[in-house]
Amino acid sequence: HGNLYLDEYFWIPKFQELRKVASGMAIHKKWRQTYFSTPSSLTHSAYPFWSGALFNRGRNKADKVDIDLSHSNLAPGLLCADGQYRQIVTVEDAVRSGCNLFDLDQLRMEYSPDEYQNLLMCEFVDDLASVFPLSELQACMVDSWE
């Protein structure tokens, strides 16, 4: 048992299954669960966990929460109504806060505008209209443990 730190969880296939099992390692109240990631797709299995939709499943209407996931709301960090602390930190936020490790002009040249928004500005990809949505591609993946 101990603290659980899960990095890049928006890129883990079958995230809900992993979370259900791994969270048991930090089930005692003295341990912490910390999840952090660059966003992937709105259809990723981790999105309901991030958005609060997972918390709302099976709850009465009066007990459901509505979480404002906007950058302006979450940039300073916020303990939300579902008990999760959420924070969005973009590369531009980091630079404004004094981090001098990034060359934003170089990053804008290196990444396409869509990649920059997704990977560095914490915007989710809406792949619902894609020819191959992420959820369908993940269904084609092979798990070497199976």
Where are these regions (language model features)?
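ASCE P-loop NTPase helicase motor core
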Residues: 3, 13-107
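Walker B catalytic acidic pair
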Residues: 7-9
